Amino acid sequence: MNQTSHRKAKKAVIMTAADSVAIALDDLASGDRVKIRSLLQEIVGELKVSDSVPYGHKLSVKPVAKGAEVIKDGEVIGVASQPISPGQHVHIHNIVSLYVPPPRTKAPKARREP
């Protein structure tokens, strides 16, 4: 048997079928093969990782053109600042986030009960 047959299968989860990214459930190294699972644990794809992707980070599961929307959990989370290939790490180096933090509200002062 070769060495790769002894290695634990690497995993990532995709939240919806419309998503262009999956979330790494393991630390992924360039060259790793990763099984993409749905929330129901069904294997919906497999791809070769082209960049190191830390646990909890996003990796592309389909080609994303420069200027195209990046979708996670069925929501647009940003726009690609460069072309992104399947298996690439998706983070601030290749997307422009559309996240807008909610306005800060002043917390009410605590009152002591008499």
Regions found by a protein language model. Name each.
Residues 2-114:
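N-terminal small-residue-enriched
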